[in-house]
Amino acid sequence: MNYQLLWKSAIFSVSSMMAISAVQAAPLNVMTEDYPPFNMQGEGGKIVGLSTEVVEELFKRAGVEYKLTLMPWKRAYEDTLGTPNTALYSTTRTPEREALFKWVGPLVNNNWVFFSSSTANITVKSLEDAKQYSVGGYNGDAAAEYLKAQGFAKLQLAANDTANVKKLEAGRIDLWATGQYLAPYLASKEKVASPKPIFVFKETQMSLAFNKDTPDELITKLNEILAAMKADGTIDKINAKYQ
């Protein structure tokens, strides 16, 4: 019997539980924004969505107590940056954000897509092609930040992505840069024609971002549990509900 291996495993298990106990001095403050179908307000004010289901199952398996709050993205982002015992989802893990947080994920895939209106005749085959058009995004969104960094001079930022549904339909923007699932969802909600996806400009994934003061042992434990959820088919079952 490999007693050294057993001893190391025991130490790791105890360390993991200590990390969870340390966080549980108060419930973990988990924040999210209204970003359907990943995170959104459902009936009775309950926070629901694809990512929410993954997060709830993850914390259930880990035995982590938490409080879930829906708020504007920029406020949630700044709070998670500056306040211990906080986490934020669904957060795109970009090079610019990598060192700002500790990460558990990915939770879900969410490609960034240029959409045109249902009646427009626009062809985009590259980011350079898209620069000639007015493009709608929203403040604080990772996709909008990415396009800014790529030199999109005609980028128009709204307070939220719902505004871009109406702007695209009214012809006030030529393209809408957003997640692959969000555009058709919001169009249906606003009762307008579903926009046309014309170019995937970046393949992305979204994760749980934790304040930097979060114990490494807890991050490791949560990533292990998330990997187990993928291996046992839990993630696939949740995804299937939103297809």
Where are these regions (language model features)?
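Short beta-strand-to-loop elements that line the ligand-binding cleft
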Residues: E65-P72, G137, A153-N160, K167, ...
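Flexible hinge/capping segments at coil-to-helix
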Residues: S116-S134
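Periplasmic-binding protein-like
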Residues: E33-D34, N110-V113, S188-N223
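Ligand-binding clefts/hinges and TM-proximal coupling segments of bilobed small-molecule sensing domains
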Residues: E65, A142-A159, A227-Q243
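A ligand-binding cleft/hinge motif common to bilobed small-molecule-binding domains
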Residues: E78, T91-L100, D174-K202
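Sec/Tat signal peptide C-region and signal peptidase I cleavage site
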Residues: M18-P27
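Extracytoplasmic small-molecule ligand-binding "clamshell" domains
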Residues: A26-L100, D232
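Extended ligand-binding regions for polar small-molecule ligands
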Residues: G49-R61, L208-Y242
